[in-house]
């Protein structure tokens, strides 16, 4: 959306289960978006090419339920309610205060200067781990790995700064023939 419409807005969720992808939410854009094509290409790129992996990019069902963003949310995103109220009373506002927010608020991280990616160290490390996990799978280093993988990194902070990595968890989908000893 943003490539073709820099002012576009997307508030969508994706649910994936065996053989089915559901994309739902709200989009405001002047451009066309081939959602089923994007879903299939993303699954293919991630390595979901066999129903034995839980989903096959070529044969899975793709259900799309997307509507235009509501006018209330659109107005809130365009200009914060507080700014709209203040503009009516005194006509002045700070640019940073003018930005509104939509109705979704699940967060994994936040912008900060802990890393070059401007994300918390926990998020940056997790992203690097799952990128390496994906590379190892795609290059066949561990031929039993399947596409689903995730990580969580816990960092201890002291005085607001990262002090040490406390815990690293990596979960990787794998074939049923792999023993626990092989995974350890």
What function would you assign to each model-found segment?
Residues 18-20, 37, 44-184:
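Glycine-rich, mobile lid/loop segments that gate access to catalytic sites or pores
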Residues 29-43:
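Active-site-surrounding "flap" and adjacent substrate/cofactor-binding loops of secreted or lumenal enzymes
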Residues 1-11:
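N-terminal, positively charged regions that mediate nucleic acid binding
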Residues 1-3, 25, 118:
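Short, N-terminal intrinsically disordered low-complexity segments that are rich in Pro/Gly
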């Amino acid at each position: 959306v943003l490539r073709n419409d820099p002012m576009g807005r997307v508030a969508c969720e994706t649910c994936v289960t065996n053989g089915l992808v559901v994309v739902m939410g709200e989009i405001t854009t002047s451009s066309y978006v081939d959602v089923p094509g994007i879903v299939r290409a993303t699954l293919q790129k991630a390595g979901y090419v066999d129903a034995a992996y839980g989903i096959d990019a070529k044969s899975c069902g793709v259900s799309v339920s997307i509507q235009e963003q509501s006018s209330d949310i659109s107005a809130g995103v365009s200009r914060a309610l507080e700014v709209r109220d203040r503009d009516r009373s005194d006509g002045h506002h700070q640019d940073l205060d003018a930005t509104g927010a939509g109705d979704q608020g699940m967060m994994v991280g936040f912008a900060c200067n802990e890393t070059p990616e401007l994300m918390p160290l926990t998020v940056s490390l997790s992203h690097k781990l799952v990128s390496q996990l994906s590379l190892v799978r795609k290059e066949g280093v561990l031929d039993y790995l399947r596409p689903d993988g995730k990580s969580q990194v816990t960092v201890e902070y002291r005085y607001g700064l990262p002090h040490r990595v406390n815990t690293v968890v990596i979960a990787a989908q794998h074939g049923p023939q792999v023993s626990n000893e092989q995974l350890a």
